[in-house]
């Protein structure tokens, strides 16, 4: 799976939702999402860019296990939970425009 379109009004990205999607490269999480759960992106080894909106207020500590941290860039909102999480966990990040 290279591209995924979220259904309207999705509130969370569930446990193991994208587990092993090795061809997934970029994803934009909609601003209806508040939670990224346990190993939601586990082993998404080709993931290079993820946009996480300010609406996300919880990211499980294992959500990105197995992703290549040195190649993954988070696009976040300044002052958001995602920015704080990225800093605390040493993810590369940039600010959304």
Residue ranges and their predicted role:
Residues 1-12, 22-35, 45-58, 68-84, ...:
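Structural signature of tandem-repeat unit edges
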Residues 14-19, 37-42, 61-63:
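Consensus positions within tandem repeat domains that build extended binding/scaffold surfaces
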Residues 88-90:
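Short, structured coil segments at secondary-structure junctions
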């Amino acid at each position: 799976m290279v591209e995924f379109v979220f259904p309207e009004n999705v509130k969370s990205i569930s446990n193991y939702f994208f587990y092993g999607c090795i061809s997934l490269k970029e994803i934009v999480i909609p601003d209806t999402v508040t939670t990224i759960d346990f190993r939601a992106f586990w082993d998404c080894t080709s993931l290079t860019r993820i946009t996480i909106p300010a609406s996300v207020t919880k990211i499980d500590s294992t959500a990105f296990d197995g992703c290549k941290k040195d190649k993954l860039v988070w696009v976040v909102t300044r002052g958001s939970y995602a920015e704080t999480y990225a800093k605390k966990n040493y993810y590369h990040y940039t600010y959304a425009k």
